[in-house]
């Protein structure tokens, strides 16, 4: 990597935490089962199309942020090596991001907004790990074609070049989206390269648009390119076994579908059900040589730390250990947080810390990349990212199985025991 000797100031440190009240229609994603909670600092834009599931949002003040657009970093350049205020114990995290993530902006009120990256970056900087800030590189055309079709890529590029437009009622392309999507798709690859080069022990990709809903030839759920899948496919091509843990509140239908028949990628998902996008049933276990490598643990709305810890202790961690991945990718969505307006779940920051700690122990705190997915309350995103990095780097207490198991987890254990040694 080249050192960027005059690092640009990526983000203002100040954040406005004023709160606006929001109402969600019961038909949001057709499955919202919990009332919306307060959402921190959302910009006021034009109204969304009348068919959008987002049409009921009423947003307040924006979070001020700025990025040095006039001084764009070279791909893969280190912006700064910022040791924490605390003893980081030698644990280094590559924080991979790019200014283009702030340029992907919706033409209507939208929860998937640039300030999410601001919050994630600030959360990473507040962690006790040593942060190595790295500029994402673009994913190459061949890296994208390992996941998406040529026609689909052409369509995204053409639509962006023409100024953008809606792909569906919730997913959009702007004039800057194609560039942002290429850098977002390359962020996980950049983190892998930083770890390979010895610059970091693990990585966190704070980029957008998110990716886990994107299919081979279809954008959906705010996602354009499947960032985690692009990274996984590149690792598989070099002979690695890859595991993907997806703790976003929504099932990662795109990631599961892209590797549904592959024995080289293990996909494990905890998610709200029934909920958007309607996939992720326990019985979706993969097919062909990949039978058993799709592991779904749907949980009812309102589930919190107890249910997630049960899922990790009884399903995620045992299967991860038996699979023995060379690399772990985490679709790190934070819309499962109790304060998130979309996820309908009840996690708090310490739950993300516990889950990340268990993964850190499982992976010996290396060869792991977290990639930002959902999460629409800025304060919750910031606090949860801090907790995630601290948990992975320093967490020492393994997740313990609750005395009484969650019945939804019981069902997952019963099904997945056909392929894995679970009790």
Predicted ranges, named:
Residues 8-78:
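Polybasic, low-complexity intrinsically disordered segments
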Residues 68, 80, 99, 119, ...:
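N-terminal beta-strand/alpha-helix entry module and adjacent surface
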Residues 87, 92-95, 155-423:
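A general "terminal functional-core" signal
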Residues 91-146:
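N-terminal low-complexity, Ser/Thr- and acidic-residue-enriched intrinsically disordered segments
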